[in-house]
From Swiss-Prot:
Keywords: Coiled coil, Disulfide bond, Glycoprotein, Membrane, Transmembrane, Transmembrane helix
Locations listed in the record: Membrane
Domain of life: Eukaryota
Protein name: Uncharacterized protein F44E2.4
Chain ranges passing through the membrane: 1263-1283
Pfam families noted in UniProt: Ldl_recept_a (PF00057)
Compositionally biased region (Acidic residues): 34-45, 1016-1026
Keyword Disulfide bond in annotation: yes
Length: 1283
């Protein structure tokens, strides 16, 4: 048998070198056939030891344990592995589904490039022991000799024969999907088997002889690299043969057969070998209940015998994708370090599937932050396959809770015969309880009515009202909880009580059943005595429900209510037995039996426990916090309410439109708009309104409609039209009030808010200024200003709620989407019910409040129990991943109190002590001057005066009661929104930013000086403070100093020495650094070396020093920006090294960033770079990369020059943008696409970043504006200025 030789200076290991220098597999030597052309492989060779090919490919890959591996050697191995890993990554990109290795010369040439990689690798690592090579290296080591020394030479020599593998009679679909290498090897195995069978004319006898060795070696390779073969009959290969085809095989002599089956000669042997192979595998020692851990140790699992493990079905799924899963090991490692998900072991297949799925669902939350999009998508695909297994196995239908021994902890526990509800069902049921909010009031009516008579009366309004509410509740459960009509046992006893107490009497057949005996029941009602007054005990149900809402012994109270209702039936049973017909007693017993069966089904014992009353009377202890970490909201949202989509500013605004808009708005801004008094001089309101109408007509056809202009227009629309006359009555007082220092501070805070944060900024302004205006100017003025602010906020975001629009006592969302509002409404339903009852406690005047103060404690205690459920349900929103702010002053009032063992007692003690000081003369005087002045006494009006009341009584209360009552009342009385923070989150005042970058006054003043002052004037401005400061109330402006002339030569040398740290990374525009693979090293160097070096300089070159630090900080220390930079970095880096990229950035390198003209030069230079490179970057890297580059360069340009404008990039018509931040479906969230406000003044947008507390939970980098108007900024200063 002849083989074409592959010439080389030295043959690879495990091969035999023929005398003529050609290479053949080592096990061909001495096999009785001359495979070398000179026959040297069959000549006796003394002193030479060879190794069989099958021994090579099956050699162990782990010669030692991890403990024997030196760290330095492992690093060396990893470095030596890089060429092979890179080669395999290129192979993974090949499309082997539509192209065959045996017929495609392109694919063959790709594999030839890797033929010497193992030799190079072995020379690189030398004689290492105990270290684990990369799994890809192991796989290629098994495949290389087979491919390069056997398959490739044979395919080239007999190309015509192997191309016949494309024959339609050969089934090419039977390949492994484990990995590209597995798919390749199994496709060769299938093709050679087929060619051996059909023996096409294009195959010579030499070619036919080559097929069998190749096929046999593929079997070894498939086993060695742990390929998962497709499910097919192991004993035969089926081929579809054309009737006209002549076969040279002896088995094809029968022309009548359409199907030719070639039986494997060693069927039983192969089966036995497979079983032995499975049995010989080591036992599975990886805990697959930890989903991410199983992905990290994928090869260990797939090489183990997991057939008897409950997780075997999952192991089959992940092992089918083992190489693809293994590529993202870094992702799994990072996730394991941070995720804290509950791990539940399993004893059955269904338990394993559900446990794995739940654990993976929890881990995905962390993976979204730590892993690449491709890794996330892979996990989502895997989760979908597990879901398919759950559905196919009917795990949800067959799932039954294992019988548990009763917990002997002294408490009362239900023993329901129903399966436990899932977390999603529990959350859905909590939402349905909203339908029963009014049921408690209706139940109290039974105390004055005859229970049986009302049920038997078809026209009973009480029963009809109760059953109407219950019908809506049941309809909600059917639609959102019991979709498969399978009931479950609720953890919330209120749901169970509703079913026990209401289902029997509200069923369609119950009332007609008793209505037949109404005459008898009516007679019983008129003759009722103490023994037959059965409904009297039902009066306690209202109080029982009240206690259950507070979370007090819910399970025990449920059964107590069940026994009360049953006793009522028993009482009626005795009366009916004595005075009614036998049919009436039978029908009543039928109804009682139905109710009893429901109670026992929900878990109540048939006989009441002897200590039931004692359990209910016990003090309530604060439950231990749940150890299971919060998960993304799994509650099914209620139907999304119809809400108008908030306006989005148009991004298409040409230079001509910008100039036209400047001219239109200039006359209006000359009146100096003000957020409270409309304009700086309110008496000129008529002239200002004329200018506003002119502005409207002028800008009607303009494409430039920035958000701030919309808000300003809404304010003027209100002040100049419908509320003009009212404004003229209160304008003087509003103007005077706006001069007060506290109000001026409010306006300053508002000025730092961007239009995109209008809702939050407007709420702060409203809560801060309205009380002052109300006190100084009266309610009419306060109402006018409140409407004025609301118009501004709603013009920018129609969903925004400000001031009185915020419902009292409810959990609300600020700046939330319709989907987020739906989640809040759903998760907060029980809390909102309690909040509505808090409002009732504050009605009726001060005496009523003091009387009801005892009822406030249990209400708050109930809220404490429900707060944790709410935070778990809405955890995703509370993490700060979106701009949605969840607010509840009631929840914040309970912060700290709810952590005590007895929250009700703590609140009761503190508030009772506070109002117990009413006998103190000074305390009484404080009440008369604040609370007693209220005409309408409710929680909303009380909040307006409580701050003054607290300040007045503080000394007395602290001396007698301590600080706690003050803290509770402050939280309840705050006029601001009360953001709910997740568990253990630090408390940061929402209206006090933790870090302030250059203030609005600085930015505005710099723009003003550009248009109104000389350059020399601006240079004389005082140096800007570097610490966070309260905006000055004077007209003095600030600008950063630029000591470019006073540093001297030594200062320049020190600065340039710091810059050398950047030079080693080839610092440049567009890609920022030359090698995109070194971002981690660059950021480490910048934070540890470069930034401290520059900040330590005695003399800094500004603005170059600050701009350089600001640019690096905005990338390296913002996780999302750094992630995007790494995502696009390789492509951007390659572009900057291309001829086109070099041409675009060459002129930028000529800019002297230390020169006094650098701000203007940098602005022009960055603009030129962006104009030159945008289209090419879009072609190479996509429009997402363009937007990323634009964002960081806009920030860089503004750090040099606050008034710099970059031309906004526009996508080409045929561009396609790939969303690299796609979130998996299980998260229920899609990425928020932020449309940049192209005409927003840069000062406002920069101010937005100042106003928001920067923390680790920030999920998106600050949005930089792309357009700024110098003249508009100069004219708008009075709009935000302090008076």
């Amino acid at each position: 048998m002849a083989t074409s030789a592959v010439q080389s200076a030295a043959c690879p290991p495990n091969t035999f070198t023929c005398a003529d220098g050609s290479c053949i597999p080592s096990d061909w030597k001495g096999d009785g056939e001359k495979d070398c052309e000179d026959g040297s492989d069959e000549e006796a060779v003394t002193g030479e030891t060879t190794t069989k090919f099958d021994e090579v490919v099956s050699a162990p890959t782990t010669p030692g344990s991890d403990e024997d591996c030196d760290w330095g050697m492992q690093q060396r191995i990893d470095n030596c592995s890089e060429p092979i890993v890179h080669f395999l990554s290129q192979i993974e990109r090949l499309n082997l589904k539509n192209m065959s290795f045996l017929t495609s010369s392109e694919i063959q040439s790709r594999f030839e490039a890797g033929c010497n990689l193992m030799t190079t690798y072995q020379e690189c690592v030398g004689n290492q022991k105990g270290c684990m090579p990369d799994e890809g290296v192991h796989s290629w080591g098994e495949v290389e000799v087979f491919m390069c020394q056997l398959v490739l030479p044979s395919v080239k020599e007999h190309a015509g024969c192997f191309k016949s593998s494309a024959d339609p009679r050969c089934d090419a679909s039977k390949t492994s999907s484990s990995s590209t290498l597995c798919g390749l090897v199994t496709s060769i195995q299938t093709a050679t088997s087929c060619l051996e069978t059909i023996r096409p004319e294009t195959c010579s006898s030499d070619a036919i002889e080559m097929l069998s060795p190749i096929r046999e070696e593929t079997e070894h390779i498939v086993s060695a690299i742990r390929c998962v073969t497709p499910e097919q009959h192991a004993s035969s290969t089926t081929l579809i043969v054309d009737e006209t085809t002549e076969s040279t095989s002896a088995s094809a002599e029968d022309d009548d057969d359409d199907v030719l089956t070639t039986n494997t000669s060693e069927e039983s042997t192969a089966t036995t070998a497979h079983d032995e192979e499975v049995e010989n595998k080591p036992a599975l020692n990886i805990n697959m209940a930890d989903a991410v851990n199983s992905l990290y140790y994928i090869y260990d699992i797939c090489s183990a015998n997991y057939s008897a493990d409950p997780f075997a079905a999952i192991a089959d799924k992940i092992c089918a994708k083992q190489d693809e899963i293994a590529k993202w090991s870094n992702c799994y490692q990072k996730t394991l370090e941070k995720e804290k998900c509950a791990i539940r072991n399993a004893t059955s297949k269904c338990e394993a599937l559900i446990s794995y799925n739940n654990n993976l669902d929890c881990a995905i939350v962390t993976m979204n932050d730590e892993c690449e999009v491709d890794a996330q998508n892979l996990v989502v695909e895997l989760q979908e396959e597990v879901n398919d297994l759950i559905i196919a196995g009917k795990c949800f239908e067959d799932k039954k809770e294992e019988e548990k021994e009763p917990v002997n902890d002294g408490d009362f526990h239900l023993q329901s015969t129903l399966p436990k509800c899932t977390e999603e069902q529990e959350n859905g049921a909590l939402g349905c309880l909203v339908e029963l909010v009014e049921i408690n009031k209706k139940l109290t009516a039974f105390a004055n009515l005859n229970f049986l008579l009302e049920i038997a009366s078809p026209n009973s309004t009480v029963v009809e009202g109760i059953c109407s509410l219950f019908a809506r509740y049941e309809q909600c459960l059917s639609a959102t909880v019991f979709k498969n009509s399978q009931r479950c046992s609720f953890a919330s006893p209120l749901n169970s009580l509703a079913r026990i107490g209401l289902a029997p009497i509200c069923s369609l057949d119950s009332r007609p059943l008793l209505s037949k005996h109404r005459d008898c029941f009516e007679k019983l009602a008129t003759e009722a005595d103490e023994d037959t007054n059965c409904q009297s005990s039902l009066s306690t149900l209202s109080n029982t429900v009240q206690m259950m809402l507070q979370g007090v012994h819910g399970e025990a109270l449920l059964c107590k209510s069940f026994y009360t209702i049953r006793d009522t039936f028993t009482c009626g049973e005795r009366a009916v037995k004595n005075k009614c017909e036998a049919d009436a007693l039978t029908d009543l017993l039928s109804l009682k039996t139905k109710m009893t069966s429901l109670g026992e089904e929900e878990g109540c014992p048939r006989d009441p426990p002897a200590n039931l009353d004692e359990i209910i009377s016990r003090p309530v202890a604060r439950p231990t916090p749940v150890t299971m970490p919060p998960r993304a909201p799994t509650a099914k949202p209620l139907p999304i309410p119809s809400a108008p989509t908030p306006p989005v500013a148009s991004s298409k605004c040409s230079i001509e439109d910008q100039k036209k808009f400047e001219e239109c708005v200039k006359p209006l801004t000359s009146f100096q708009p003000h957020p409270l008094s409309v304009i700086a001089i309110p008496r000129d309101i008529d002239q200002a309104c004329e200018a506003f109408h002119t502005f409207k007509a002028c800008s009607a056809e303009s494409n430039c409609h920035p958000l701030w202009a919309r808000g300003m227009s809404a304010m003027f629309e209100y002040a100049c039209n419908e509320a003009n006359e009212q404004f003229k009555k209160v304008r003087k007082c509003i103007r005077e009030t706006s001069m007060i220092e506290e109000v001026r501070s409010c306006v300053s805070d508002f000025s730092r808010g961007a239009p995109t944060a209008a809702c939050m900024s407007s709420n702060r302004l409203h809560s801060c200024a309205i009380p002052q205006i109300q006190g100084k100017c009266g309610q009419d003025a306060a109402d006018w200003v409140s409407n004025y602010i609301i118009r501004f906020a709603n013009a920018i975001d129609v969903r925004c709620k400000v001031g009185r629009q915020l419902p009292v006592g409810r959990v609300v969302g600020i700046g939330c989407s319709a989907e987020e509002e739906s989640i809040i409404e759903h998760c907060a339903a029980p809390l909102n019910d309690i909040g509505s009852r808090v409002e009732e406690l504050f009605a009726g005047g001060m005496q009523s409040l003091i009387k009801n103060i005892n009822s406030l404690a249990p209400v708050f205690a109930g809220a404490c129990n429900l707060t944790d459920e709410f935070k778990t349900c809405a955890h995703f929103l509370l993490e700060g991943r979106t701009s949605c702010v969840v607010s509840s002053c009631m929840v914040e009032a309970g912060r700290g109190i709810c952590q005590l063992s007895d929250p009700a007692k703590a609140i009761d003690d503190n508030l009772s002590c506070l109002f117990g000081q009413a006998q103190e003369p000074k305390f009484a005087q404080c009440i008369r001057s604040t609370i007693s002045t209220l005409k309408q006494f409710n929680l909303s009006t009380l909040r307006a005066v409580l701050p003054k009341f607290i300040d007045c009584t503080r000394d007395i209360v602290v001396a007698k009661c301590g600080e706690s009552p003050i803290k509770i009342m402050k939280a309840m009385s705050t006029p601001d929104i009360c953001p709910i923070r997740p568990h253990q989150a630090p408390i940061v005042p929402i209206n006090q930013p933790a870090r302030v970058t250059p203030t609005l006054e600085t930015v505005l003043s710099s723009s003003t000086m550009v248009s109104t002052s000389s350059e020399s004037d601006s240079e004389s401005a005082p140096e800007q403070e570097t610490e966070p400061t309260v905006p000055s109330t004077t007209e003095t402006t600030e600008s950063p100093s630029t000591p470019t002339d006073g540093c001297g030569e030594s200062g320049l040398v020190e600065y340039l020495q710091c810059e050398t740290h950047l030079d080693q990374f080839a610092f440049r525009p567009i890609s920022i650094i030359g090698d995109a693979s070194k971002w981690d090293q660059f950021c480490q160097m910048a934070n540890q070396t470069y930034i401290p070096c520059v900040e330590g300089l005695k003399c800094k070159y500004e603005p170059a020093a600050s701009a350089q630090i600001g640019l690096i900080d905005s990338i390296c220390n913002r996780k999302i920006t750094l992630k995007d930079q790494k995502q696009h970095g390789m492509c951007l880096s390659e572009y900057t090294k291309s001829d086109a990229g070099v041409a675009c950035i060459s002129d930028f390198g000529k800019i002297d960033q230390l020169d006094s003209s650098s701000p203007a030069q940098m602005c022009d230079g960055i603009n030129q770079v962006m104009r030159c490179s945008t289209s090419e970057i879009e072609k190479r890297c996509g429009f997402d990369a363009v937007l990323h580059v634009f964002s960081i360069h806009m920030h860089w340009a503004n750090l040099f020059n606050a008034s710099c404008i970059l031309e906004s990039p526009e996508p080409t018509k045929d561009s396609t943008s790939i969303d690299v931040n796609e979130v998996e479906p299980s998260r229920d969230q899609k990425p928020v696409v932020v449309t940049k406000d192209e005409t927003t003044p840069v000062s406002i947008t920069t101010a937005m970043n100042n106003d928001i507390t920067e923390s680790e939970t920030t999920q998106s980098p600050p949005v930089q504006s792309s357009v700024s108007f110098h003249i508009i900024l100069a004219a708008l200063i009075p709009f935000f200025a302090l008076f």
